[in-house]
A protein has these predicted regions:
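N-terminal, intrinsically disordered, polar/charged segments of Gram-positive cell-envelope systems
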Residues: 23-50
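Extracytoplasmic
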Residues: 46-48, 68, 112, 121, ...
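Mature extracytoplasmic domains of secretory-pathway proteins
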Residues: 72-120
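C-terminal motif of bacterial Sec signal peptides marking the signal peptidase cleavage site
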Residues: 15-16
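N-terminal secretory signal peptides
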Residues: 48-90
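Sec-dependent signal peptide recognition
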Residues: 2-10
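Short, compositionally biased
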Residues: 128-143
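Well-ordered alpha/beta subsegment
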Residues: 140-165
C-alpha cells in the first residue's frame, strides 16, 4: 500500500513539474518575437560620438567609450569647448585637473598610446605610452601611433582643447 501511495505521489510531482515547465516556456516565446532586435540594429548603425582634441596645431578625433563616464564627459562638452593646461607625468601621459568631477567606472586596464582616461573622477589624461591601473577609459584617439603622439605632445606642458563633434 505504501508503495502505491509513493508511486502516485511521484507521478503527481512529475505532472506538476511538467506543467510548470510548460508555463515557463509560453511567456518567453512572445518576448523572443518582439521587435527589440530592430531597435538594437538601429543603435548599432548609429555613428559613435566623437571627441575632438586640439593640441598645439594638431587636431585629433577620438571615439568615446560606452560608459556613463564618457557620456557625462561628452554631455559636459556640449556646453562648450574645454581648454586644459596638461603637464607631463611619469613620461607616459599628459594630465590635467577637470573643472568638475565625473562618474567613475574604474576597472583594471592596460592603457596604450591614444587612450583618454578619467583618473579619480576629477582628472583627465592622454596616454602616449603604456600603463596599468584602475582607470575609467573615456575614449581612444583615432588613427595615431605612439611615436606620432609623443612628437605632438612633446616634453613639458601643453594646452589641449576638448570638444564634441
Amino acid at each position: 500500500m505504501k508503495g502505491r501511495i509513493l508511486y502516485i505521489v511521484i507521478l503527481l510531482l512529475f505532472a506538476a513539474c511538467s506543467s510548470d515547465a510548460a508555463s515557463f516556456v509560453k511567456p518567453t516565446q512572445p518576448e523572443a518575437q518582439t521587435p527589440k532586435s530592430s531597435a538594437s540594429s538601429s543603435a548599432q548603425t548609429e555613428a559613435p560620438v566623437k571627441l575632438k582634441i586640439h593640441v598645439n596645431d594638431t587636431a585629433f578625433t577620438a571615439t568615446l567609450e560606452e560608459n556613463s563616464s564618457a557620456k557625462a564627459f561628452a554631455e559636459f562638452l556640449t556646453q562648450g569647448d574645454m581648454t586644459l593646461d596638461m603637464h607631463d607625468y611619469g613620461s607616459f601621459e599628459k594630465v590635467a585637473d577637470l573643472p568638475r568631477s565625473f562618474p567613475r567606472n574604474d576597472k583594471q586596464i592596460d592603457t596604450d598610446a591614444g587612450d583618454i582616461i578619467l583618473y579619480q573622477g576629477n582628472s583627465v589624461t592622454i596616454y602616449y605610452d603604456k600603463n596599468s591601473w584602475n582607470f575609467t577609459r573615456l575614449a581612444r584617439i583615432d588613427n595615431v601611433n605612439k611615436k606620432r603622439l609623443q612628437q605632438i605632445l612633446g616634453k613639458g606642458n601643453v594646452k589641449a582643447t576638448f570638444s564634441v563633434e
